[in-house]
């Protein structure tokens, strides 16, 4: 007998959701044709053969913009459910969310002062 019977559904879901991708990769490996022709080994970009040097170096600016975007995107993910249940949660959760936003604003000011948001 399973001791934590209230978690049966959780463990069943975890096992099934772990087995589905493993089985998909296994079946794909068995059914996929194995061919190492010249077209398979050549590089292409969006279905077009590259002309000249295909390697392009991206500047750190793109990385910094992406990083700042991800930080504020995650902020939105956390703040949206809070805003939807604001009237139920009360003032203490409002203070916690305010502290969270203030920490992110400090991070934004730091990135701004370091020049992470400067394009030129």
Curated annotation (Swiss-Prot):
Q: Which UniProt keywords apply?
A: Chloroplast, Membrane, NAD, NADP, Plastid, Plastoquinone, Quinone, Thylakoid, Translocase, Transmembrane, Transmembrane helix, Transport
**Organism domain of life:** Eukaryota
InterPro entries, sorted: NAD(P)H_OxRDtase_bac/plastid (IPR023043), NADH_UbQ/plastoQ_OxRdtase_su3 (IPR000440), NDAH_ubi_oxred_su3_sf (IPR038430)
Q: Does the keyword Iron feature in the UniProt annotation? A: no
Top-level EC class? translocase
User: Could you list the residue ranges forming a coiled coil in this record?
Assistant: none
Q: Known EC number(s)? A: 7.1.1.-
- Lipid bilayer topology: Multi-pass membrane protein
Q: Where in the cell is it found?
A: Plastid, Chloroplast thylakoid membrane
Where is the chain membrane-spanning? 14-34, 64-84, 88-108
> MF terms per GO, please?
NADH dehydrogenase (ubiquinone) activity; quinone binding
- Example GO biological process term? photosynthesis, light reaction
Principal location = plastid
Catalyses: a plastoquinone + NADH + (n+1) H(+)(in) = a plastoquinol + NAD(+) + n H(+)(out); a plastoquinone + NADPH + (n+1) H(+)(in) = a plastoquinol + NADP(+) + n H(+)(out)
Q: Which Pfam family, any one, appears in the UniProt record?
A: Oxidored_q4
- Please list which residues make up the signal peptide: none
**GO-annotated cellular components:** chloroplast thylakoid membrane; NADH dehydrogenase complex
Assembly = NDH is composed of at least 16 different subunits, 5 of which are encoded in the nucleus.
Please name the HAMAP family in this protein's record.
NDH1_NuoA
Summarizing the function annotation, the protein's role is: NDH shuttles electrons from NAD(P)H:plastoquinone, via FMN and iron-sulfur (Fe-S) centers, to quinones in the photosynthetic chain and possibly in a chloroplast respiratory chain. The immediate electron acceptor for the enzyme in this species is believed to be plastoquinone. Couples the redox reaction to proton translocation, and thus conserves the redox energy in a proton gradient.
Q: In which family does this protein belong, per the annotation?
A: Belongs to the complex I subunit 3 family.
> What is the official name of this protein in its record?
NAD(P)H-quinone oxidoreductase subunit 3, chloroplastic
Q: Give the organism the record lists.
A: Coffea arabica (Arabian coffee)
Q: What is the lineage of its organism?
A: Eukaryota, Viridiplantae, Streptophyta, Embryophyta, Tracheophyta
């Amino acid at each position: 007998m399973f001791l934590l019977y209230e978690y049966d559904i959780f463990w069943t879901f975890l096992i099934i959701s772990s087995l589905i991708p493993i089985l998909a990769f296994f079946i794909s490996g068995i059914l996929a044709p194995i061919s190492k022709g010249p077209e398979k080994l050549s590089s292409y970009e969006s279905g077009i053969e590259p002309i000249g040097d295909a390697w392009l170096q991206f500047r750190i600016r793109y990385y910094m913009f992406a990083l700042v975007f991800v930080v504020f995107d995650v902020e939105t993910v956390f703040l949206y459910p809070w805003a939807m249940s604001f009237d139920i949660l009360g003032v203490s959760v409002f203070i916690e969310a305010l502290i969270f936003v203030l920490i992110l604003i400090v991070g934004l000011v730091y990135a701004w002062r370091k020049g992470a948001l400067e394009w030129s």
